[in-house]
Regions:
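Bacterial N-terminal signal peptides that target proteins for export
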Residues: 2-11
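Sec-dependent N-terminal signal peptides
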Residues: 10-18
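C-terminal motif of bacterial Sec signal peptides marking the signal peptidase cleavage site
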Residues: 20-22
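Non-catalytic cap/lid and distal C-terminal segments of serine-dependent acyl enzymes
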Residues: 24-294
Length: 294
């Protein structure tokens, strides 16, 4: 376990804060200006998800040059609430990590929390991620087989989805990363100020105190699963974020139960500026622990 808390030392401009604003900005979400280099290729693909019963898109970024027979580890990148599958390439420089040794896959998750909905049982987004997307990608592209070569990372809602689904399906992933992960969503109490949000969360997770809530609660999972079977967990959160206490709480449980994990904090709020600052740490840790991504 490693816990790293960076000193307050970063000064940024107002322009960058506005550009990298929160993941709920639908106006910028509609634009598509991926940050790529000549060393990678990017493709948008649509496939039919059996779990959802409809066509779903994803974006895949790979090295421009892959040797015949070469197989590469894969990282599934989950977007945040209000965002979409293009966000990772539009608002971060994540594509550079695919220049030589990784395949990056960004599936569409809508506002699902990557969870099978209680109120709408046809919306099986957990099954879509852990079954359909993985099967689709790894049957079509030069992906190295097996758990040691597979990671899942997300921001905000996607961070929750990455951490939760990795703990529920530890046989699938060697590494899971949550950047500003909304790990407390299943346990948030009713608030008259946020009735619509509470109602939406209830439609996905079920009533407060229900079995479906507990089954999708990272705190409950962290207290009950076998730490020895879990993937390496990477958590990070900005020091100006409302989600910091929730992530600290999860890190404390991981520490108490002997998980292999690391937890980072640093200056920043709930936005891509802060997440971009953490990407080198994420991929350093990821590449140390995945199959051939050295």
């Amino acid at each position: 376990m490693t816990t790293v808390e960076r000193p307050h030392s970063i000064v940024v401009t107002l322009f960058l804060f506005l550009f990298a604003g929160g993941c709920g900005n639908r106006e910028t979400q509609q634009q598509d200006h991926p940050r790529l280099s000549p060393k990678v290729t990017m493709t948008d693909v649509t496939f039919r998800s059996s779990a959802l019963g409809r066509e779903m898109p994803y974006r895949i970024v790979m090295p421009s040059s892959i040797s015949p027979g070469q197989k590469l580890p894969v990282v599934y990148l989950l977007h945040g609430g209000g965002g979409g599958y293009r966000d990772w390439t539009n608002y971060s420089d994540v594509a550079r990590y695919a220049e030589s040794v990784l395949i990056l896959v960004m599936p569409e998750g809508n506002s699902s929390y990557y969870t099978n909905s209680v109120e709408h049982p046809e919306e099986r987004y957990e099954d879509y991620i852990v079954s359909d997307v993985i099967l689709e990608v790894e049957s079509k592209y030069p992906v190295a087989p097996g758990r040691p070569n597979r990671a899942i990372v997300g921001v905000s809602m996607g961070g929750y989805g990455a951490v939760k689904n990795a703990m529920k399906h530890p046989e699938l992933f060697a590494f899971a990363g949550g950047l500003s992960a909304a790990v407390d969503v299943p346990t948030r109490p009713f608030s008259i100020k946020r009735v619509s949000q509470w109602r939406f969360h209830s439609s996905i997770f079920g009533p407060s105190g229900s079995e479906t809530r507990r089954d999708n609660d990272p705190y409950v999972l962290a207290r009950t699963v076998d730490p020895g079977r879990m993937p390496y967990l990477f958590l990070t959160c900005g020091e100006q974020e409302g989600l910091l206490p929730a992530n600290r709480k999860l890190a404390e449980i991981l520490q108490e139960r002997g998980f292999t994990y690391e937890f980072h904090t640093g200056p920043g709020d709930h936005n891509w500026l802060q997440w971009n600052a953490q990407l080198p740490n994420v991929f350093r840790s990821l590449q140390e622990r995945m199959g051939h991504a050295k």
